[in-house]
Amino acid sequence: MRVRSVLLALGFVIALPLGAFAQASISGVVRDSSGGVLPGVTVEASSPVLIEKTRSAVTDTNGRYTISDLRPGAYRVSFTLQGFKTVVRESVELTGTQVLALNGDLEVGGVQETITVSGETPAVDLQSTTRQAVMDQEIVSAIPSSRTPFTVGVLIPGVRKGAFTGQDVGGSVVQEVASLEANGGRTSDQRMMVNGVALSSMIAGGWGGGAVPNATGTSEFAIDVSGVDAQAATGGVRINFIPRDGGNRFSGTIPFSYANDSMAGDNYTGTDVQARGLSVPGNIKANGDFNPGFGGPISRDKLWFFLSGRKLFADNYVASTFFNLNVNDPTKFAYAPGSQAILHQEQTIYQARVTWQASPRNKFGTTYDQENFCACSTVIGPQPGGAINSPEAGVDRRFPLQRFVTLDWTSPVSSKLLLEASGIHRVERWGGMEPQEGKLGNIDSLTPGMIGIADTNDPVTKTALNYRANTAVNPYNNSWNWNIHYRVAMSYITGSHAFKVGFNNAYGHHENTTYSSPAAPIVYNFTAGAPTGITYRLTPRTVKVNVDHDAGLFVQDKWTTGRWTLAGAIRWDSFANSFPEQGL
């Protein structure tokens, strides 16, 4: 077992957002016309995005208030105190985990008199050092990409994509497995979350996995690239999805996009890469995205739903790579290039969300998400080592089952005390498998028993070339895992003081089998078209591992006085895994 702990230093800056499980907050000071602070002012934030309609707080002896656990959207904020005119702020926009500074100035008068303030300069977050980019529906829809946090996140300065990913332009990459890193950090430190709970697999350090909530079913996603708080065990990029909740009226949206090669530009002809020998460039063949969503009330102010689905595909021509005309012919040992090779990617997502206001102080929400994905066939074309993989030597990267179910509970016991709990159960199956039927150009599928050839200097392409069948050692795998993540927290918030304590844990099982084609456990080694040797591949091997616990406990506190904010936190983590009995 490995145990680690960390103490976040105290400082005269705020490093801790107040939001519940990465929700937004409104905080400020209420004064009278003379500048004196006003205790006892009732501050209410109301919005159509809240199934409970309104959240409220009362200013403390220093005139300060904080309203936490607010979902993204437009709010109407009112300030009310007997003997003073009511002040209303309209169209207050909240996004991400921001702590919005919103002060109130009350004039003497009757509460029946109302002063409405609108059209002012938007209030900004002055209390958090977290560097965060919030991508709402408007932003995601406006950017020509496949509308995932990975394709949009790379537009943030200092952020880049890690392994398993390509550069997406205009929806040309259906990126189901991706990672982001910021400021030179590690991709393994990335954490994807739904309502603040990790949506992680049991592999690769827990940075992610195949499941990604679809864009229409998401109200917004926030990408934190620095200044993360004690609720996180790692310091890498955090991507938090806020599910779309429906509402008190029926509404829907149907985003759709399509592109083909006639819409693509030419940045190849007459360029340096052509002069250096790139025989044909990569380009799009066709891609499309259909992502409808619909929601509304089952019972007004009580029970909401939102349903969404998504179908994406992208067919791309692969640079300097061609279908082999001699594929599936066991009598032919030479490579004969035909038409340009195509990489096919497709993804299907079904998602449902239900929100239930069980009582004034108990709100529940649940999300069901099921997905499948295939990059068919991938690992083709020019490879990092300099060799080229012909399409029949590639691998289908398939995710036939990606499923997660979330359950969250929020209870504002009072205007100061907030209780919350959330959990995710996830099941994932994926693997690198033999090329799928219909994805090899001039044939329906690869004939079992075809033996791959690895030529260090193919006489046709004048490069290292792998063709006829896959030539890697145990190139295929069948992997599955299940895991459960959960967390609980309690927040005690006054206007000047914010205290939060929480606990998170995860456990699960991962199993992976690597293998080669049973009908062809060998590879022919060639040089310049002549045989030089044979490589015999290993038999299937299965590795099993359990994550017994991945637990963390955190305590954080913040105190605000005047223009100063003092914050500090302590986090303790414990991790343990085990390996069931297994053999080679």
Language model region names:
Residues 2-138:
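Periplasm-facing N-terminal accessory domains of Gram-negative outer-membrane beta-barrel systems
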Residues 60, 84-247, 260, 264, ...:
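Periplasmic N-terminal accessory/gating domains of Gram-negative outer-membrane beta-barrel systems
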Residues 69, 144, 173-174, 231-233, ...:
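Short sequence motifs at beta-strands and strand-loop junctions characteristic
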Residues 113, 149, 178, 190, ...:
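Outer-envelope beta-barrel architecture signal
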Residues 119, 254-260, 307-311, 366-370, ...:
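Transmembrane beta-barrel strands of outer-membrane/channel proteins
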Residues 225, 243, 292, 296-298, ...:
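Residue-level signature of outer-membrane beta-barrel architecture
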Residues 251, 282-374, 397-423:
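Transmembrane beta-barrel wall of Gram-negative outer-membrane proteins
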